[in-house]
Amino acid sequence: VVTTHKPAPRHPRMCAGVAGRAARALTTAVSALALAIGVLTLAPASAHADDAVPSQEYFSYYHLDAARQKGYTGKGVTIAFIGGPVDTSDPALSGANITDKSRCTIQDGPKGLRHSTDMAIILVSPYTGVAPDATLYSYQTRSNDTQSTGTCDTGGEALDSMGKLINQAVEDGAQIITVSMAVPDTSDELKWAVANAISHGVIIINSAGNSARDENSTQLARWSGVIGVSAINSDGTFASYSSWGNGVVTAAFGGPFNTINPDTGASATARGTSISAALVAGMLTLARQKWPNATPNQILQLLVHTALNPNHDWNQQTGYGPIDGGALVNTDPSQYPDENPIIDKPGGSSPTAKEIQDFT
């Protein structure tokens, strides 16, 4: 997430084409893990600086007030968030259903703690969360802001490896796993953890990165079946900071997001594909609530068939197109085949369909 100097948030512009349709959406090896959080400058205090819980532009962009009025709140769905510790004392998370399911505990720095807390806010905040009634399980893993690995290194074994945490989330009953950090791990442990998640119908989401380049080789989205998410601006254009690659499946609003500078406590705004990934995870949570009888494969088919690129054509920047949250809850996925549409990614990916079948 890149924190930048921005004025108070405005209502998103409702442009024609892709941006207009998106804005109308909900009305009709572990040590290599790197969490990219760059603070550039402080933002001025916004109109909501004195409020305990600031407003968020994505809430109006995706018309989440209308979603809540229709009963789309994620009730009955469990999300797993893999990242740093979450500060559940944050006012925006008051009343949220969050359980720390970590296999061990780390000591994170202020940037990492703020980042993870912001992701939880996007997912399940009763005030500005996409899926306020969903259950959130959090799993701690180290990042480049980690100050101590705490209890996570035991006898030479890393208890917080991405593969172990994905397997743990699957075992704990999560239906959606979201990861807003780079994961350059290419181990067999992670490969088979992804296969395990797919075979159990668990959907995995991963941010594309914020380096404005092809980051496919350093992202979890390089693996078969994982939804890579890039960022768009509020006018629907591809965000200049967003990374891309063969693992990208969709895109979503990447900011501004109203947050707090972790070093000073001052109001700040942030942008990044971490925000986009959390929004996609939240909207897929609403789809799983709305369509409980659909298979996870059909939910994935729904995502790619309703994404907003013309004819849903795929490209490295936005995948099949920006997510259309409205279509996810208004289009019956039972019309689509029970086949995972993102197993064989462009350029090839692992595990293969046969490996997943053999694993099962």
Indicate where each model-derived feature is located.
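Extracellular S/T/G-rich loop segment that most often corresponds to the catalytic His/Ser-adjacent loop
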Residues: T218-Q289
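Subtilisin-like serine protease catalytic core
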Residues: R68-I79, P85-T99, Q107-G155, S224, ...
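Structural recognition of the beta-strand scaffold that forms the well-ordered cores
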Residues: T78-G83, T135-Q140, V170, Q175-S180, ...
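C-terminal subdomain of the subtilisin-like protease fold in secreted/lumenal serine endopeptidases
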Residues: W291-T360
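Solvent-exposed loop/turn segments at secondary-structure junctions
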Residues: G84-T88, C104-I106, T128, R142-T146, ...
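N-terminal domain-start motif of subtilase-like serine proteases
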Residues: A52-T78, R103-D108, D324
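Secretory targeting and sorting signals
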Residues: V1-A49
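Substrate-binding/access-modulating region of protease and related hydrolase catalytic domains
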Residues: D145-A221
